[in-house]
Amino acid sequence: MKISIISSSVRIGRKSHWLALYFKKYIEENKLAEVKILDLNEYQFPIFEERLKFQEAPEEKTKQFAAEIVNSNGVIIVTPEYNGGYPASLKNAIDLLHAEWKRKPISFVTVSTGMFGGAQVTTSLLFSLWKIGAWVVPAPFPVPKVIENFNEKGEALDKEAT
């Protein structure tokens, strides 16, 4: 089984990436699946102009990202909440593909520095994923107060709480 974890923030000083690292480590240590982080900060996709299938000369990184999604048995999206929504980098990546998302099992981890763990982003992300035909796991994983609960290496500071 192969799982892709999308680390969606490209922000300087991002904290949500810590959770991508945490889940990768957890899945590997428990031998649950082959796992890879697809870090949108590394891809740096240009602003969306056209879906991949309609691009005349798509960049290699775009084709590689699409192949990772297609070849994954499931996807975990790790996203911060920005003003009640998810970052433009994630919207850009979602819109870049279309058929690749259809019937793809997707779960998401929402992250915030506040008390609610990105609860507001759940609605907007869920709606976008439903519209493209993804199969969304009905149990998001909200992470509140990320700075108090995880470090930059993706380690839980309170192991009893994870």
Go through each PLM region and give its residues.
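A short small-residue
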Residues: 1-5, 45, 105, 144-153
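N-terminal beta1-alpha1-beta2 submodule of the flavodoxin-like/Rossmannoid cofactor-binding fold
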Residues: 1-79, 84-92, 156-162
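Glycine-rich phosphate/pyrophosphate-binding loop and the adjoining helix
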Residues: 29, 136-162
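A generic structural signal for alpha->beta connector loops
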Residues: 32-34, 103, 133
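Rossmann-fold NAD(P) dinucleotide-binding segment
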Residues: 87-103
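Short, glycine-/small-residue-rich phosphate/pyrophosphate-handling segment
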Residues: 105-145
